Curated annotation (Swiss-Prot):
It holds the Pfam family 2_5_RNA_ligase2. The keyword Lipid biosynthesis does not apply. It is an enzyme of class 3 (hydrolase). GO terms for molecular function: 2',3'-cyclic-nucleotide 3'-phosphodiesterase activity; RNA 2',3'-cyclic 3'-phosphodiesterase activity. A motif (HXTX 2) lies at residues 127-130. This is RNA 2',3'-cyclic phosphodiesterase. The active site is at H42 (proton donor), H127 (proton acceptor). A motif (HXTX 1) lies at residues 42-45.
Length: 184
């Protein structure tokens, strides 16, 4: 049986309230945005899609081997932004200040995943997705609010583990379940 899987760093629980307040500010635009539930907030390192049991075991081994070269590290979450651009907003995110270690970790993992047949990530930017735009209503107001939040400081957290997660899509939204948690 295949599962929809991805590799991620969970947002520190102590920062969820602050992110929820930022989401509340963005909700005031009354735009067509599906906001990420606080318990689902994470930094994606790699989305695998549907993978079978054998490939999951290989992914786990690659992650375990790669993480041996890393110690826990701190990141600061700061600034709101969008993908792909402010004129056509699809994703609203919060960024990572000084993301070098985070980006290096992602690159190291991705190089190994490419050897397994996964597509390489292009132009990876460490970010915390806070919402996905579903329609055009009040997009200008949303863009204005995001602009006002471009320097917002969320806080710092220690990255000490990476989670291999299952994503189950439901009408109420995705349900994420940890399949394996790896310590740095």
């Amino acid at each position: 049986m295949k599962v929809r899987a991805f590799l991620a760093v969970d947002l520190d629980e102590g920062l969820r309230d602050h992110v929820s307040r930022i989401q509340d500010t963005l909700k005031s635009a009354d735009a067509q945005v599906k906001f990420v539930e606080p318990e689902n907030l994470h930094f994606t390192l790699k989305f695998f899609g549907d993978v079978g049991e054998g490939k999951l075991r290989r992914i786990e081994n690659v992650v375990r081997d790669t993480l041996r070269g890393y110690e826990p590290f701190e990141i600061s979450i700061r600034g709101a932004g969008v993908f792909p651009n402010p004129r056509y907003i699809r994703v609203v995110w919060l960024g990572v200040e000084n993301p070098e270690t985070f980006s290096d970790l992602q690159r190291s993992l991705d190089m190994e995943f490419v050897k397994m047949g996964f597509r390489p990530e292009r132009d990876y930017v460490p970010h915390l997705t806070v919402g996905r735009v579903k329609g055009p209503r009040n997009r200008d107001k949303l863009a204005e609010l995001i602009g006002e939040l471009q320097n917002v400081e969320v806080g710092s957290m220690r990255v000490s583990e990476v989670s291999l997660k299952r994503s189950e899509l439901t009408p109420a939204g995705p349900i994420y379940t940890d399949m394996e948690v790896f310590r740095l």
